[in-house]
Amino acid sequence: MKVLPLSKIHFIPHVHWDREWLRSTDSSRIKLVYFYDRLIEMLENDPQMKYFTFDGQTAALEDYLAIKPFQKDRISQLVKNRKLFIGPWYVQPDMIIPSGEALLRNLLVGSKYAAGLGHCMNVGWVPDAFGQNKITPYLFKEIGMKGIFAWRGFDYDVLDDSLFMWQGNGDASLPTVHFALGYGHYRGFPEDYEEVKKDMTDFIPKLEARYQDQEVLFMLGSDYAFPRKHSSKTIEQLQKDGYDCIMNNPEDYLDTLLNAAKKNHHQLKIYQGEARSAALGRIHAGITSTRIDIKNAMRHYETMMAKVIEPMISISRFQGGYCDQELINYFWKIIFKNQFHDSIYGSSPDSINHTVENRLLNLRHGLNELIWMNFRYLAESVDLSVLKENEDILVLFNTLPYQRNDYAFTSMIVKDKNFVLKRQDGTIVPYEIMNEVKATSHDIEYYNGMENFHDAGEVLEGTKFKVQIKIAASFLPPMGYEVLKVCFHERTSKRPEGD
C-alpha cells in the first residue's frame, strides 16, 4: 500500500543568477541570452508552466534587453500576467557590507524598473547573501513588500519553523520564509519518474519537520538552472498518483502559508535582529575582509553619492540648477553592480576583480564631474559684481542636514599666499594654511579649466600658489553654502576654532 505525505507540496521554479562570479559579466550574458530566449518560449507556449521567478532582481533582465531590446514587449506581457516574477532588487547585493542607504536605493531602482514592465514581485528575495542585516525587514517594509524569503544566517536552535516573523530595527517586522534546505535543494526534476517519486520520499520528511502547517516548499532551481521542459508534466503525473502538489510563485505561496497559520492558530515565532549563524549554510565570514581596497572604495563612493552629490544637486536645483534623476540613477547602478554579492566579496578570479576596479574608476571620473557641474550652476547664482580687483571668491558647502562643528579642508590656486577670508557682512573667517606649493602650469590649467567648464584657456593671470587650508565650518548653514571673499594683500592672525 502506497503511503502519501499529508503535506501539500509547492514547487517554485526559479533561478539564481550570478551576474559575475566565476565568469565575467559578458560571459554570463551569453548564457543569459540563451536562457531568456528559451524561457520566453516556454512560458508563452506551455500553459502548464504557470510561473517562473527570476532571482528577485532586474539587472540581468536589463543586460538581456541591452542585447535584444525587441523582446521587451514579450517580457512585459509575461510580467504583467504574473508568469515571470522579477524585482524588487536591481542586483542581489551583500546585506552586510553596503550601507543601508545603498541597499534602499538598490530596492527603489529595481522595484521601479520591474513595475515599469508590468509588476514588481512584492516579496523580498535574499537567497544567497552571506548573512542578514537587522535592517532587512525595515527596508522591505519601507517599499511595500508583504514578506521575505531568505536562507543563510538563521539557526534552527532559535527557530522552530520555516515561517516566522522577523523583527528588524524599531518596530519593523515582516513574515519571513526560510529556505529550509537552501534555495537550490531541488535543481530540477529527473526525467525518470520513478526517481522523482524516490526524491519525494527522501525530501518530504525533512521538509515537513520545518513546516508546521504542512505547506511544504520545494525550490525547483538553483544557480543558472534552466527549468526542465517536463516539469509541468511531472507535476501533473504526481497529482494523478495522489500527491497534493502544485506549481507556485513566492507571492501566492506566502499567502497560502499565512492563511494556513491563521487557520491552525499557529502563533508565529518572532526572530529579532541580524542573522549571522553558519549552522544551516556557510556564511564565509572571511569575505568581509577580502579585497579591502575594493570595499573601502565602494564605501567612499556610496557615501559621496548620498552625502555629497545628491545634497549638492538639491541645493543647486533650489537655485534653479539642472537635475537629471536618470543620470543619478545611472551612477547608482554602477555602485549596485559593484555591490552584487560576489563582486563586493572579492570571491571571483582576478580577471573579474579587474572589472570591478574599472567600474570604480568610472565612478571616480563620473562623480567628480557631477560635483563640478553643480559647482558651475551654483557659481552662476553668485553675484560677482561686488568683487574688487584684488578679490576672488570661495564657496563652501555643507551637504549635511545639520550644523557642523568640525573643519572644512579645501585646496585653492591663489595669486598670493597672503589673503583674508571674509563673509558677505565683512566678518573675517579664520583659517590655517596646512600646505603650500608653487602651482605648476598643469595645476593652474586644471584648476581654472574645472572652474570654467573645462575652458582651460581662461587662466587667471597671476595664479601661482596652490594652498590647502583648514576652516572651522560651524558658520555653514545646514544643507546650504556660504560665499566667502578671498581678499589678497590683507593679513589676519586669527586661527580657526572647531572640534
Regions found by a protein language model. Give the residues of each.
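Contiguous transmembrane helix-bundle modules in multi-pass membrane proteins
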Residues: 421, 461, 481-483, 488-489
